[in-house]
């Protein structure tokens, strides 16, 4: 059966978007707010109608992720910021495999996310309450699966409890995208053997987005 590289690329961009947001948060203490909203909202939608629907139904919502994906796929340097993004992306993929193979872990994750949906009736998605709740899910359900993702950035920034919560919530969104990536036929071998297909697909999607003014 032929693989749907459009859906695979969208889901991969979702992982990369989380990686980029984590990097921004760790170095600057803040990140692209619109992209963060899209990523966090993807955690909540448990029954999407399509891959694109997970990310709000618009390709433009994944602009940050698509641009990051191109950087990761074509990274010639193993040092610096691109190396960080590649490490975060691959680490999220490894953790997703551990999540999917751990008995009962996906059920536990689903139950905890249902709890988030109830909280959303009273609190905003990016409120400290929701951020803390999503971070707690990451700490309780994902972190024990190991190995832990080492987030690098400004030590002063990373000491902030609010930034720590946002980073963990964003990593949870990355896990969500990695689960989706496997569901639509993604696999790590594609990063080696289908790099050109993924690059072409990402460029095609970006090409018909309206330019940012």
Curated annotation (Swiss-Prot):
Q: How does it sit in the membrane?
A: Peripheral membrane protein
Localization, UniProt: Cytoplasm; Cell inner membrane
Q: Is rRNA-binding there in the keyword field?
A: no
* Key words, A-Z: Cell inner membrane, Cell membrane, Coiled coil, Cytoplasm, Membrane
Q: What is its main location?
A: cytoplasm
What this protein is reported to do is described as: Negative regulator of phage lambda lysogenization. Contributes to the degradation of the phage regulatory protein CII. Acts probably by holding CII on the membrane surface, away from the target promoters, but close to the FtsH protease.
Q: What is the official name of this protein in its record?
A: High frequency lysogenization protein HflD
């Amino acid at each position: 059966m032929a693989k749907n590289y459009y859906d695979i690329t969208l889901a991969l961009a979702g992982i990369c978007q989380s990686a980029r947001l984590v990097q921004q948060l760790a170095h600057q203490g803040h990140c692209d707010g619109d992209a963060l909203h899209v990523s966090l909202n993807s955690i909540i939608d448990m029954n999407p109608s399509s891959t694109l629907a997970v990310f709000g139904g618009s390709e433009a919502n994944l602009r940050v992720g698509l641009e990051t994906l191109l950087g990761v796929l074509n990274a010639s340097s193993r040092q610096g910021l691109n190396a960080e993004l590649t490490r975060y992306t691959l680490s999220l993929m490894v953790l997703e495999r551990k999540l999917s193979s751990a008995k009962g872990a996906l059920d536990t994750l689903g139950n905890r996310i249902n709890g988030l949906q109830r909280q959303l009736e009273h609190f905003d998605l990016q409120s400290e309450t929701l951020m803390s709740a999503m971070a707690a899910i990451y700490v309780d359900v994902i972190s024990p699966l190991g190995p832990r993702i080492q987030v690098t950035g400004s030590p002063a920034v990373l000491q902030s409890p609010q930034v720590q919560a946002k980073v963990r919530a964003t990593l949870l969104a990355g896990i969500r995208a990695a689960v989706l990536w496997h569901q639509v036929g993604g696999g790590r071998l594609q990063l080696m053997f289908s790099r050109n297909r993924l690059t072409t697909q990402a460029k095609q999607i970006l090409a018909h987005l309206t330019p940012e003014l």
